[in-house]
Structures are given as structure tokens and as C-alpha cells.
């Protein structure tokens, strides 16, 4: 084999996940997009769940083993049934990445109740609904991997981020409890807690973002996605309950 052939073959993604079926929420941008693409590269069949999955699907090569599902995860009453429909369409589910989320910046004294509820519906209750949808299938096959994308804001409170912090603290508690419940069924439930990540979420916050926030010094979605893939690819007999990933620049 020539050096050129060897180099070319070594650059090809290793298809460790051929035959696996994955669902990724918040998959049209940011962390969700990056991890969904890596799952595809690893050979998995991937369902892209977001309000606008066409944004990313239009970028994929023809014939990609991917399908988009336009779902508003904040409309919590219908989430479980819609995820069950995806599982039926895929013919099963092996991997769930709960990534969709939103933030609110402002003092708690000024936060409207409807904004609080909207944040918790997406950041926490939609995760609960997705879990209820996938767990029966994963239990029946006695294996599965679930990764909940939390935040360092689920470990430390930050001023003006009270609602977001509360939702992520709650998500970590949910993850830990479900991990204990599902371990006897062969299902891994893990969390990843990134520090600041330069995602489109910041664009939705407008002038509420302090000028001191240097987005260029934050983690990239690709870096977080690589860490998530490390969790996905762990040996069957290993689990990382909670992975904290921080920017080397020292930002939260």
C-alpha cells in the first residue's frame, strides 16, 4: 500500500455506529448540529429534531442516512407522542442526545412567569417527555445511551441567570436519578456540563449579553460535540456519569 493510500484511508471516519439509531434534539445549529453530523460520520442513522431541520438537512450529501423532524419541543403536551412516532419511523432507537435549550438573562425580580415557564418547558420538561418516549424501547432491547446536555450553570449559580441555572440544576438531578433507575436495564444515562459555548443561543439574547463576554474565547460547538462522542463511544462496561468541559481561557 502506498503512503498516499494509507493517508487517505486513515482520514476516513471510523464507522463505529453502523446500525445504531440516534435522535438529536436542537439539531439544526450549534452543539446539536455538530454532534448529529458526527453521529452520521460514525455510521448511525440520525433523526434531526428541531423547529427548522431543513436548515441542516439541505447541507447534507444526497443519500445521507438522516431525516429531519420539525418539532417544537416547547409545546410539551405533544412531545412524547412525536418522539414515539420518530422511533416507529426509524424502527427503534439506541442513542438520544437531549440538547435543545434556551436561556434568559435578567434579574429574577423582573422575570415574567410565562418566560420562566417557557424556559422550564424546553430545558427540563421536554427532556422528561423525550425520556418517557425512548425508555420503553431501550428497556426492551436492554441497552441504550442517553446524554443530557446540561451546563456548568447546573453546578454554580450566576447572577442574572437564575432561571437557566435552576433548570440545569434540575436537569442534573433528573439525569442522576434516571441513571440509577435505568442502570439495571443496561441503559447508560450521562450528562455533559460545558462552560460557555459560542452557539447561536447568544444571538437570541441581544443586548442582554454583557460586552465583556468574549465569544471567541468560548468553547466551540465542535469541541463539545467531540466530547459527547467520547461518551457515546465508551465501552459497554464503562460510563462517565457527568463530564465537565471548560474553555481553556478560564471562562465559566
Each model region followed by its residue ranges:
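Conserved glycine-rich Rossmann-like NAD(P)H-binding loop of the short-chain dehydrogenase/reductase
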Residues: 42-57
Amino acid at each position: 500500500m502506498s503512503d498516499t493510500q494509507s493517508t487517505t484511508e486513515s482520514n476516513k471516519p471510523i464507522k463505529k455506529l453502523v446500525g445504531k439509531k440516534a435522535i438529536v434534539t436542537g439539531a439544526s445549529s450549534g452543539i446539536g448540529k455538530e454532534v448529529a453530523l458526527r453521529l452520521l460520520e460514525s455510521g448511525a442513522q440520525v433523526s434531526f429534531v428541531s423547529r427548522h431541520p431543513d436548515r441542516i438537512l439541505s447541507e447534507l450529501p444526497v443519500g445521507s442516512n438522516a431525516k429531519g423532524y420539525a418539532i417544537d419541543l416547547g409545546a410539551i403536551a405533544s412531545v412524547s407522542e412525536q418522539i414515539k412516532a420518530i422511533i416507529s419511523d426509524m424502527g427503534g432507537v439506541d442513542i438520544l442526545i437531549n440538547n435543545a435549550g434556551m436561556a434568559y438573562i435578567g434579574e429574577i425580580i423582573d422575570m415574567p412567569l410565562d418566560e420562566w415557564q417557557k424556559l422550564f418547558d424546553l430545558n427540563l420538561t421536554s427532556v422528561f417527555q423525550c425520556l418517557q418516549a425512548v425508555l420503553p424501547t431501550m428497556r426492551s432491547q436492554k441497552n441504550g445511551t442517553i446524554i443530557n446536555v446540561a451546563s456548568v450553570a447546573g453546578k454554580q449559580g450566576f447572577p442574572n441567570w437564575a432561571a437557566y441555572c435552576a433548570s440545569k440544576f434540575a436537569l442534573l438531578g433528573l439525569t442522576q436519578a434516571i441513571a440509577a433507575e435505568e442502570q439495571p436495564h443496561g441503559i447508560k444515562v450521562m450528562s455533559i456540563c460545558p462552560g460557555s459555548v459560542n452557539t447561536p443561543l447568544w444571538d437570541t439574547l441581544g443586548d442582554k449579553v454583557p460586552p465583556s463576554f468574549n465569544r471567541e474565547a468560548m468553547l466551540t460547538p465542535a469541541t463539545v460535540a467531540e466530547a459527547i462522542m467520547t461518551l457515546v463511544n465508551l465501552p459497554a462496561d464503562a460510563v462517565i456519569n457527568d463530564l465537565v468541559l471548560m474553555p481553556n481561557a478560564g471562562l465559566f
